[in-house]
């Protein structure tokens, strides 16, 4: 347990502060740096749930599901050799894209909508632990990315709705829910909140 605790502390440090401390010496991590983790939704024996503070540092939680039929057919027909992976962007291009996203504007009305979503998650009777302030800030950042992907320089409520469940569900804890069921329950509640929290008028954010 002590070793697991030390690993969690170190993981939180690298994910939040972009540095690692070992034997009292701090090492900055090269940018861009990010962590990708996988989780098997079926086999959970022998694993332990991550603490809430560490889950909160993951920007998104995505479920890939099964491939489409056409994709599986393509897998069967490809050569047995492992396909060669080629980079699609350089580190410099990723950093430049990050700087461009910072220029995407968020109106006061949309900011207030984000705050209302966060507070609604904390006040929902089915939620024990709602969206944190860090989670709300993360939702703001991914909404900027969604706006850019949709070809706009400003965030709309639709951008938030498009990505919110993927950003919120893993950060919340449902009341009386087993570990295996928690994320599915929280995703359903997040989608419910997106339908019930009032959206600002278009004239306030456009």
What are these regions (language model features)?
Residues 69, 73-77, 111, 115, ...:
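An amphipathic alpha-helix signature
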Residues 123-206:
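C-terminal engagement/docking regions of AAA+ P-loop ATPases
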């Amino acid at each position: 347990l002590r070793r697991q605790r030390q690993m969690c502390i170190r993981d939180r440090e690298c994910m939040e502060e972009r540095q690692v401390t070992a034997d009292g010496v701090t090492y900055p991590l090269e940018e861009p740096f990010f962590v990708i983790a996988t989780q098997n939704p079926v086999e959970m024996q022998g694993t332990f749930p991550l603490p809430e503070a560490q889950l909160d540092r993951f920007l998104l939680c995505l479920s890939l599901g099964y491939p489409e039929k056409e994709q599986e057919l393509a897998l069967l027909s490809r050569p047995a050799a492992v396909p060669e992976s080629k980079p699609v962007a350089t580190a410099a291009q990723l950093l430049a894209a990050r700087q461009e996203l910072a220029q995407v504007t968020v109106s006061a009305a949309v900011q207030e909508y984000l705050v209302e979503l966060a507070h609604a998650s904390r006040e929902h009777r089915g939620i024990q632990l709602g969206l944190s302030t860090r989670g709300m800030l993360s939702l703001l950042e991914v909404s900027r990315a969604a706006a850019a992907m949709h070809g706009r320089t400003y965030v709309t409520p639709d951008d938030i709705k498009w990505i919110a469940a993927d950003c919120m569900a893993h950060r919340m804890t449902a009341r009386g829910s087993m570990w295996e069921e928690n994320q599915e329950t929280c995703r359903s509640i997040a989608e419910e909140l997106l339908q019930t929290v009032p959206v600002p008028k278009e004239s306030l954010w456009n």
